[in-house]
Amino acid sequence: MPFRFGTQPRRFPVEGGDSSIELESGLSSSASCTGKETSPNRQLRRCPGSHCLTITDVPITVYATMRKPPAQSSKEMHPK
C-alpha cells in the first residue's frame, strides 16, 4: 500500500500563551483565534492560522538591527 502524503492532520507545538483549556475542549486553534492576545507588558498578535505570534507596535529600527550586522564598506573590505 503506497504512502499517502497528508493522511494525518498536521500538529503544531503548543506555544506560550496558548490556552490548554481550548486545546483540551477539542476546539481547533483557528476556530478559537480572536486575532489578538493581550499581555500585561506588550501586545501580541497571532497570524490567521494561529501558527505564530508577532509583537505589535515595535519600531522598524528594532527589526533592522536584529537582522544582521551592517555590511562593511568597500574601503574597509579592500584596504590599499
UniProtKB/Swiss-Prot annotation:
Region annotation (Disordered) ranges: 1-45
Start-end of Low complexity biased regions: 15-32
Comp. bias regions, Polar residues: 33-42
Pfam annotation, one family: UPF0731
Cross-referenced InterPro entries: FAM229
Family stated for the protein in its record: Belongs to the FAM229 family.
The protein's name in its UniProt record: Protein FAM229B
